[in-house]
């Protein structure tokens, strides 16, 4: 496409920002995999004192993708991710993309009625949530015919031993125990399924293919599902970096906006992870923790 100053007079004010970009046409996972091959030892994300490299992150995604195939997930299936910003959320999101599924992103503080609506509206056959939100899914599961599997993760599974002890003595002790015979798959058990899966699991998707369902605010009525493509997010990532010429791979983003939010997923997570940035995952915002993380990680964004 030839861009002329007559048709686009604003290009004279762009400075070093290019007038056009050559957009990556693959999937969101492939964008992350591509940057991981370039910077394997760079840190992809930090979470409560633990850091994970791009190399390890891609390995986690692939293991999760194999686990999804092991429980019967097929291309085009919808998987609800009802989680705060934590490692399991990011891993599952890209694993769903890798197997050709569509991630249905839901606010974990949604009411039971809202969760039932999101599950039915999307036709989700699988859901991932935290142990502390298990009761919501248990309450609505019998009303959602499509839902075959509920995977339960726990914040404590991603913590170092000293921090885990503190967590279990404070926040962790408030979480209601899940019955031993509950029809769920624990995150660790789920990953073990992936390690035993030996068949094909990767599905190539193009930019135009659907990848994510986000939900509108519902200010003018019932909330609406918004279907977004791989290209929507890959293009956003490239645009964000192109308009920030001072960005360098390894720069840090304090990812406090949640992944069920368009800005949180598109800018805080995918723009960083598709361009070699480092995400400091924040599961819950408080002014005190936010200030501490800013000082500790010296975040650029």
Regions found by a protein language model. Give the residues of each.
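Conserved pre-ATP/AMP-binding loop-to-beta segment of ANL
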Residues: 176-215, 222, 245-252
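Conserved AMP-binding A3 loop
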Residues: 53-55, 202, 211-235
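A short N-terminal helical cap/helix-turn-helix that marks the beginning
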Residues: 2-5, 21-44, 59
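Conserved AMP-binding/adenylate-forming core of the ANL superfamily
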Residues: 33, 41-86, 90-94, 111-116, ...
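Short beta-strand->loop structural element characteristic of the AMP-binding/adenylate-forming
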Residues: 80-82, 89, 93, 97-132, ...
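Conserved AMP-binding/adenylation subdomain of ANL enzymes
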Residues: 234-252, 260-301
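Conserved structural elements of the adenylate-forming
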Residues: 58-63, 192-197, 226-248, 256, ...
């Amino acid at each position: 496409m030839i861009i002329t100053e007559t048709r686009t007079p604003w290009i004279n004010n762009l400075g070093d920002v290019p007038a056009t970009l050559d957009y990556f046409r693959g999937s969101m996972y492939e964008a992350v995999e591509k940057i991981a091959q370039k910077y394997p030892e760079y840190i992809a994300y930090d979470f409560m004192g633990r850091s994970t490299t791009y190399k390890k992150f891609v390995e986690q995604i692939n293991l999760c993708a194999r686990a999804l195939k092991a429980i019967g997930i097929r291309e085009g299936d919808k998987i609800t991710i009802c989680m705060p910003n934590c490692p399991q959320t990011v891993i599952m999101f890209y694993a769903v993309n890798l197997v050709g599924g569509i991630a249905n992103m839901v606010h974990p503080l949604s009411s039971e009625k809202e969760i039932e609506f999101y599950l039915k509206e999307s036709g989700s056959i699988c859901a991932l949530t935290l142990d502390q939100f298990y009761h919501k899914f248990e309450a609505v599961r019998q009303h959602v015919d499509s839902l075959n599997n509920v995977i339960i993760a726990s914040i404590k599974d991603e913590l170092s031993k000293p921090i885990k002890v503190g967590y279990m003595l404070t926040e962790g002790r408030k979480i209601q125990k899940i019955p031993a015979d509950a029809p769920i798959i624990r995150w660790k058990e789920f990953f073990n399924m992936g390690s035993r899966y030996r068949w094909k699991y990767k599905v190539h998707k193009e930019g135009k293919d659907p990848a994510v369902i986000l939900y509108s605010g519902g200010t003018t009525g019932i909330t609406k599902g918004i279907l977004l493509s791989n290209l929507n997010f890959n293009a956003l990532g490239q645009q964000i970096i192109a308009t920030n010429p001072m960005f360098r791979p390894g720069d840090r983003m304090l990812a406090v906006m949640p992944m069920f939010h368009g800005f949180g997923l598109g800018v805080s997570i995918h723009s960083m992870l598709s361009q070699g940035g480092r995400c400091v995952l924040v599961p819950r915002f408080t002014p005190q923790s936010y200030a501490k993380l800013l000082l500790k990680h010296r975040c650029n964004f």
